[in-house]
Amino acid sequence: MSEEIKNEEIVEEVEATEEVVETPEKSELDLANERAEEFENKYLRAHAEMQNIQRRANEERQTIQRYRSQDLAKKILPSLDNLERALQVEGLTEDVKKGLEMVQESLIQALKEEGVEEVATDVFDPNLHMAIQTVPATDDCPAEHIAQVFQKGYKLHERLLRPAMVVVSE
């Protein structure tokens, strides 16, 4: 009997030792799996971040391309205004007037090709117009409508280059 008890104790000790040995191996495996999962998450985040950076860079490039002519258009607009004023002067010969109109039309066409267009001047919109004066409303010009335009406004695609300077009826 004592041999059986000793054998049982030895078997129990061996099983206990095996359990102790299995636990560290299993925890090392778990740690390795956790680290692998952590690295995979970091990789996925870094990959997503790179995609976001590329997307933002593409959007920025497209925006720059779309509005590349903004500065030039702002510099040309005063010349266009001067041509319009010159055409309003009385006493111009037909040849001079026709020449000025041709220059004006070519400038307007060049600006249109770049996406520059005149701001509508029907109903007053504080986002597009600058009210420099108000006048009482009449039958011809109801309230919140533009009675007179002092300077035309322009926008490049949906971006305002210059607000129209207007007289608004109230």
Curated annotation (Swiss-Prot):
Keywords, comma-separated and alphabetical: Chaperone, Cytoplasm, Stress response
InterPro entries xref list: GrpE (IPR000740), GrpE_coiled_coil (IPR013805), GrpE_head (IPR009012)
MF term (GO), any: unfolded protein binding
SUPFAM superfamilies hit by this protein: Coiled-coil domain of nucleotide exchange factor GrpE, Head domain of nucleotide exchange factor GrpE
Pfam families associated with the record: GrpE (PF01025)
Region: Disordered, residue numbers: 1-29
Subunit structure: Homodimer.
Gene: grpE
Subcellular location: Cytoplasm
Protein's UniProt name: Protein GrpE
Principal location: cytoplasm
